Amino acid sequence: MKVTVCELSNHPEEFARDWDRLAAHVNEEQSELVLLPEMVFFPWSAWSKKFDPVIWEAAVKAHEQAEDLLRKLSPACACGTSPINKDGKRLNEAFVWEKSSGYRPAHEKYYLPDEEGFWEASWYERGKGDFTPVKCRQALVGFVICTDIWFFDHSRTYGKKGVHIIACPRATPRNSLEKWLVAGRAASVVSGAFALSSNRISREREKADLGGQGWIVGPNGKVLGLTSAKKPFLTLDLDLSKAERAKHTYPRYVEA
């Protein structure tokens, strides 16, 4: 299965340019699954501790109106997250989008940081805590949105449920890239699945500090590829049967 990860600009004008280039890359590579960064269709707002309802509603609207952008990735299956209003709550929701079926909710972010640059618990609430895999073409995918990935029991449970891919849309800073790659490698080892992540990237003088670097990690923790400023898109053809076989090897077969 051909999968694509990326790093996309937080700046609106640069994002538009990046999106056109991503669409061209996906078309050329004939990608089947594209993982997007966290809440990518609006500039990162949680850099500010003070919640702004006007900005929140603008972000929600931008994501609701993103279907034309997603169509540029078709026929690939696009995976990402959106800010949403649901049942009186503000949430960060993972989704799977395909031209044939449209937007499908997949998971609500559960673990929310609340610190400098990432005041997420001040901007929205945690979801229900439902970590249920979703189908994306021939792959079974388990979402862990950014901070969710550090709670590895969920990746292990995803592995027990047979997922081929752990999908981690991110918005993370420059000084933590190595740490997040460690998280991806650990998630792949405990699940026996490929781990994919895409991140946003900001300008040096932007208020938001977002460091880019998407990655694809194999089912045993081997880093298969990284994105960079020079190569912001990475597409690999994954043999999903390797994830299926990995479930029967150490440490996945060990019962808790």
Regions found by a protein language model. Give the residues of each.
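Short beta-strand scaffold segments in enzyme catalytic cores
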Residues: 79-82, 92-96, 132-134, 214-216, ...
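Short beta->alpha transition motifs characteristic of CBS
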Residues: 42, 95, 107-113, 215, ...
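Extreme N-terminal starter segment of soluble prokaryotic enzymes
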Residues: 1-5
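CN hydrolase (nitrilase-like) catalytic-core segments centered on the catalytic cysteine
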Residues: 59-78, 150-233
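Active-site catalytic loop in hydrolytic enzyme cores
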Residues: 85-161, 174-182, 245-255
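Structural motif
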Residues: 33, 139-141, 165
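Short polar catalytic/cofactor-binding loops
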Residues: 7-13
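Cys-nucleophile CN-hydrolase/nitrilase-fold catalytic domain and related Cys-dependent amidase chemistry
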Residues: 20-100, 174-185, 190-193
